[in-house]
Amino acid sequence: MSDATLQLEETPAPDAPAREGLEEVIFAGRYRIQPGVVLPHLATSSSRAYLTIDSEKPDRELYALVLDHQVPARLTAILAAKDIPHDALLKPIRWGRVDWSESGREEIVIILPQPPGPPLLPSMDATTQYWTVRELKRDFLIPIMDLLRRMQDDRLTHRNIRPTNLFRRTNDDSVVSGQIYSAPPGYEQPAMFEPIERAMCPPITRGIGDLSDELFAIGVTLMVLGLGRNPVAGVSDEELLQRRITQGSYNALLGDNKLHADLAPVVRSLLRDEEHERWTLADLSNWVNSGRVNPSQPLPGTRADRPFEFNGRTAFTARELAHILTTDWNAALKVIADDTLQLWVDRSLNDRDRATEISECGPLGANGPRQMTDDIRLARIITTLDPIGPIRFRGTTLMPDAVGPAAIFAALNRSKSADYTDLIAGKMMNYWHEKQPRPKTWMLTASETVEKAASYLSDSGVGFSIERCVYELNPALPCLSPRLKGSVALQPRELIDAMEQHAAGGELLFDRHIAAFFAARTTGRVDRELHDYDRASNEAERSVAQLRLLAFVQSKNSASITKNLYRMFLEELQPMLDSYRNARLREELLKDAKKAAAKGSLNDLVRIVDNAKKRKWDERNFQVATRRHAALSAEIAKLQTDEKRLQRQAMLLGRQISANIACVLSVLVIAVLVFSRIG
């Protein structure tokens, strides 16, 4: 079980409600999560909420959020919250993974204190007694503005301000913020609480944002509380977005409703769609403290004298045109094939400078992509029309400070993966930054993130590409490998443990996600092992690269004994041991490998099966033996040749001697015969 412990000042709570009979889940040895007691008012669009009891301090009223595995928690917020000295923010107590008996799988949970009162609205469809201006200032704005100042000091955004995530204390009526940890910034927000440019994006690509985005959400919250209801309940997000683009956010959200005369100019100033026209925290604080209103004066927008028509829709402004072009990308590509759009901007919008910029979207520049495509050109034109809007490229829409979460969206939706890669390679982020009328506080950080993503995407090998972006840029995301089958790994040692469990059944888990997770989360570099795996020409080389990778990860991140993984790799790499020529060395290595199996250290196995020194010694001595064998063979052959030659010479000499002896004997016989006759 893995967890990160966070300190929290303990707040006494009333008795917990009665628990139902489902089996409780024990987290971190003390937190008893009650799956049978659901807390719907604390749940979010990506997480479930359950009553939780602290075994050591049962008087504390807690709850557990069970997270969506595919939506990363805000690790920076989880770690930073404990250092924010403000009681208007609920702070996490503990988070990590837990075995969840209800589902038979592992889950990620965050333990939090329950809010000290009810939500301002139980849902965005609910109604309530409208708040007076005095209540809004005293109970809502004063504590929340002070909280935002403290968070800004820690460079942390809230991005979760809305009536359903704000709670009113039962003892003094002051407002407390709910959690901000379960999902990326802005992910849980209804689109109406987001500025237009972020509302255009899917929740996961809305971006980190800054204080200006918080003030917009405060403005919408003031409107809802001032009316006592959501003025656009039942209106779809797309319809509301279209209204906001054409009418402005304030008019589109308020509609025919009326706000208190003292509140209306404040809300209007907070809901300006141009960020530089929106009230700052200082402006809002001045109104709260003095009551004086200095409403911002928006610059009049440029509206065409005749509309641009596209697919049955009309646009009178540059932003409207940018928006409708994204509704049919292929049709929009045909529109930019000639100068029709450019001429409309020049003549109908009377904006020659922008028309010139559109004409320059095609040529390659020093900071542009290596190759210009029609898709990149169209994306540039859309950004030129609406520079403060999100980047729009084919089917992908994102704010530049959401490159990290966008990688998850791309990796889980293969049709979007190519969009993400081409968007980064096309240097759309650079172009977007160039077109900003005013710098953003987060632009430098976003640029650094984009550079990281580009470096990983340039390598398509295992452990790189889109999967590497996913884990490098989202540090709280668990490994998304489908092969884990219900296991959750937030840290490398947890993934090693999961692999060890699966290895007990003879299954070796390894895929692009697992490789990228290890590469991103392990202290030290494993790029060499990953490249060796990619370049492997056979299964043995691939297995050795895998073994070296896992051994490195185990040595850096885990004290776990991996006997099952050790056994699997030893079986797979047995042919490598058998390939040693020296029988004594081969037997010695096999003996060492079996002896080390009890420790389950993969590094020990690496030293045995991938020992370059011993392999060279074996090869060198084999070559020496081979040369000696060749020399001895030559000597034997020579001796054999000399023996045959001597045998032939001996036979020849024997024949000669035999002939000579025969001659002598013949002479002697004749002599004896002659002498016998004479005598």
What residue ranges belong to the model's regions?
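ATP-binding glycine-rich loop module of kinase domains
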Residues: 19-91
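Conserved structural core of kinase catalytic domains
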Residues: 91-134
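Conserved short alpha-helix within the protein kinase catalytic core
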Residues: 131-145, 149
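A conserved short helix/loop substructure at the end of the activation segment
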Residues: 271-284
